[in-house]
Amino acid sequence: MFITFEGIDGSGKTTQSHLLAEYLSEIYGVNNVVLTREPGGTLLNESVRNLLFKAQGLDSLSELLFFIAMRREHFVKIIKPSLMQKKIVICDRFIDSTIAYQGYGQGIDCSLIDQLNDLVIDVYPDITFIIDVDINESLSRSCKNGYEFADMEFYYRVRDGFYDIAKKNPHRCHVITDKSETYDIDDINFVHLEVIKVLQMV
């Protein structure tokens, strides 16, 4: 099974991907669950990730092509081999983030992004959890974590992108709304339990 978590920065998707990995590891064994992320996932990609996040003046198309190349590396080295071994793969960000951020957010033609994704992968997620959160709350969380962020209009476009992706892929995508303002342990557990409920129905 291939599971992905998506959402805007500060949505809590990384926390949820880790919680799900721990939960499934207790059931199926730690050796049968693979937790990974994009951009990243391999030693090479993690190095490139660090460089990209520090890059100044990189245009949106160049950034997209970097992400697509990294996805290919990640897919052939980590994701597909793990799936071939019947392992459960949980990925923090995947194709939908590219469509939402580079497509809806930065204005690159989504059909081009789809073509590039089709070029570098041949297996798609079985289930995608889109963790939705208020823009102001997400930016507040991101600031607390020391992350830089773009203008709010950009994040509204990205959030709308995730909504559209979910509407176009209702059998794969499940939107879970985090309405919390404090993001304490109860809020985190609420989202986690919603994730588990969805998994129990598939």
UniProtKB/Swiss-Prot annotation:
Organism: Ehrlichia chaffeensis (strain ATCC CRL-10679 / Arkansas)
Name the record gives this protein: Thymidylate kinase
A single Gene Ontology CC term: cytosol
CDD domains, per the entry: TMPK
A Pfam family reported for this protein in Swiss-Prot or TrEMBL: Thymidylate_kin
Keyword annotations from UniProtKB, A to Z: ATP-binding, Kinase, Nucleotide biosynthesis, Nucleotide-binding, Transferase
PANTHER family associated with the record: THYMIDYLATE KINASE, UMP-CMP KINASE 2, MITOCHONDRIAL
Catalysed reactions, semicolon-separated: dTMP + ATP = dTDP + ADP
Main function: Phosphorylation of dTMP to form dTDP in both de novo and salvage pathways of dTTP synthesis.
Residues reported to bind ATP: 7-14
UniProt record similarity statement: Belongs to the thymidylate kinase family.
SUPFAM superfamilies referenced in this protein's UniProt entry, alphabetically: P-loop containing nucleoside triphosphate hydrolases
Database matches in Gene3D superfamilies: P-loop containing nucleotide triphosphate hydrolases
Superkingdom: Bacteria
EC number annotated for this UniProt entry: 2.7.4.9
GO biological process per UniProt: dTDP biosynthetic process; dTTP biosynthetic process; dUDP biosynthetic process
GO molecular function, one term: ATP binding
